[in-house]
Amino acid sequence: MEEMALAQQVPNLGLARFSVQDKSILITGATGSLGRVAARALADAGARLTLAGGNSAGLAELVNGAGIDDAAVVTCRPDSLADAQQMVEAALGRYGRLDGVLVASGSNHVAPITEMAVEDFDAVMDANVRGAWLVCRAAGRVLLEQGQGGSVVLVSSVRGGLGNAAGYSAYCPSKAGTDLLAKTLAAEWGGHGIRVNALAPTVFRSAVTEWMFTDDPKGRATREAMLARIPLRRFAEPEDFVGALIYLLSDASSFYTGQVMYLDGGYTAC
């Protein structure tokens, strides 16, 4: 009897801590490279998903191709508070609650600062900072009202902490803003058991970075320079981020908040 009582008091320290089974998770930017992989992985792990994105055809392809036709789908980007609220309400309408959020939506525009249009700068800041802020505002109200904690993950970049000579005067500051938004909300919501972290990858293959993987001289030069600084001597694939995502959205990371998790093959170690 004493052994049984002791066993009941000891918390589960195995793989059950990493479970996202039946958690209601909202993914914005679900049709992007990272969003698609996250959706498939979380669905395989038993999460209940709400997928948001501006590409209706891409959402349909994701849902059908990944076999997650029970997901709630919202065709919009977080361009306004109404859009963000629509995403959150879709999760509540389908599952009755919200447990986690992955903000994988974002944008970039590469140009020297002397040639970049103000409108292009604004578009990057709106997509990467304002959009994340809007989603956090809408989701945070629900998480606070539920009173049962939760986890929010903002997709950032190693460029949030590093400059770049290749025309990133909009992107780098926007990702620094993403990092500080995560830290600020972690401090603001910590007393309510809501964790907020940023996930900061280096370059990985996607529609945005495809130019780097061509035989174009600029692409080849950029690729070789990047690889020379990555100790693992390879670029990431979206699948490399699955383990970190599941960790951050599961109870395994219950004491991890306000952090920028670098997934960069050692890039920032050099």
UniProtKB/Swiss-Prot annotation:
Keywords: Oxidoreductase. The keyword Ligase does not apply. Its EC number is 1.-.-.-. NADP(+) binds at residues 30-55. SMART domains: PKS_KR. The lineage of its organism: Bacteria, Bacillati, Actinomycetota, Actinomycetes, Mycobacteriales. It comes from Mycobacterium tuberculosis (strain ATCC 25618 / H37Rv). One of its GO terms (molecular function) is oxidoreductase activity. Belongs to the short-chain dehydrogenases/reductases (SDR) family. The active site is at Y171 (proton acceptor). It is an enzyme of class 1 (oxidoreductase). Pfam families: adh_short_C2. Was identified as a high-confidence drug target. This is Uncharacterized oxidoreductase Rv1714. GO terms for cellular component: cytosol. Substrate binds at S157.
